[in-house]
């Protein structure tokens, strides 16, 4: 087992002395309400709406890329209903086809170091950041 993976498994965070090596290690997702960490690297908010009750200081974001978030119509239709997840993934992926420059920029940032896609949804398995990460990793 590589040192980075071992350090991550032991504490949930990579050790400070390790640098992310593979693409999956370089691109993370994290709720905006979770405590920011140095190991997050560049923190990019990928929601269209600003998270409720979150100050800019507390969020500690590098950037807010609302243009890469699902459209208002798609977000409302989905309503974070897990039964709509497969169709949401398909529709959001189709929307992202018009954002090649933004996706390329995120890939470039991930090549330079850790990139954390930050989102506000309560459901950690069914949200736009999950889809976006899969696309950036070339899995969709």
Go through each PLM region and give its residues:
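Residues lining hydrophobic/aromatic ligand-binding pockets adjacent to catalytic sites
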Residues: 2-140
